[in-house]
Amino acid sequence: MSAAFDPSSYATQLDAKVARLRELLAPFGAPEPAVFDSPREHYRLRAEFRLWREDGQRHYAMFAPGEKHKAILIDDFPIASERINALMPRLKAAWQASEELGNRLFQVEFLTTLAGDAMITMCYHRPLDEAWEVEARQLAEALGVSVIGRSKGKRLVIGRDYAVEKLDVAGRVFSYRQPEGAFTQPNGAVNQKMLSWAFEAMGDREDDLLELYCGNGNFTLPLATRVRQVLATEISKTSVNAALSNLDENAVDNVRLVRLSAEELTQALNEVRPFRRLEGIDLKSYQFGTVFVDPPRAGMDPDTCELTRRFERILYISCNPETLAANIAQLQDTHRIERCALFDQFPYTHHMESGVLLVRR
């Protein structure tokens, strides 16, 4: 279910989301949510397009859900960043003018940042060779972007394989590497508001933070400045490497990062079994006051939910309010909602990002 892109109806659509969140959190005595709106257009920093052949040319195409064989041809994409919209016609002209760039090209992906960086991934149904690389290098230079070529089992990088983002949280600017193919928050303006809300909700602490699902360190960097130490977990190798680079780049030195699932971490904390990946980390030396979770759409599984119960404070960012409500229902006998927020990451859709701070009763 998606609403049409219509900036004039934005306020009405946002009101409906706020009402939905209120309704889901009402059984738990939640306070009124803080609401963080989105730019009305050009808010999406990444976009992926299939290419569709018509009249002997390849065009950017999108598809309605369940309509794989009925392409909607597009020349621009008003929800995408201004940079993506500026790059789209120039990239199209380049692949139309060059056999090397256009031959068997089937998909392109754009990643841009508020800091002005841009990366384009071009996916092919054929092997890429030096001739492609020569033309891709000229393209990258002409457009002022990094270009990545992908074909089965191979990746050629012209420039860098990540984009650089810079986000301001409470007056400090944090720099982030966003690797090609790894998850990043698509709405940069709202992400910045979300980081500021989490920073504020955390407050200045003299104890430690446990973070589950830390990704590239999006929240880790600002939250680490609020606590004594952070133990952060993540299972994606790409994200772990990006997070380590980001910690280093920002000179944040009070974070230990481990590649453990939430389930494995529970076993480690309960001393069920030792983990080699925790070598050199003394879990008993941490004084965890807060756990921060930003789980996938399915929410926390019941065991992870039970793990969070042992903490005084649970700071929870959710991309699915239904599973958030289900998790709060499991925790409500021990924790209450102290503050909550709605972040409109995905305007003109029914999706919403929300945040709650749960505090032990």
Swiss-Prot record:
Superkingdom per UniProt: Bacteria
InterPro entries attached to this UniProt entry: MeTrfase_TrmA_AS, MeTrfase_TrmA_CS, SAM-dependent_MTases_sf, TrmA_MeTrfase, U5_MeTrfase_fam
The keyword NAD is assigned to this record: no
Annotated EC: 2.1.1.-, 2.1.1.35
SUPFAM superfamilies: S-adenosyl-L-methionine-dependent methyltransferases (SSF53335)
Molecular function, one GO term: tRNA binding
UniProt record similarity statement: Belongs to the class I-like SAM-binding methyltransferase superfamily. RNA M5U methyltransferase family. TrmA subfamily.
Stated role: Dual-specificity methyltransferase that catalyzes the formation of 5-methyluridine at position 54 (m5U54) in all tRNAs, and that of position 341 (m5U341) in tmRNA (transfer-mRNA).
The protein's name in its UniProt record: tRNA/tmRNA (uracil-C(5))-methyltransferase
Species per Swiss-Prot/TrEMBL record: Pseudomonas putida (strain ATCC 700007 / DSM 6899 / JCM 31910 / BCRC 17059 / LMG 24140 / F1)
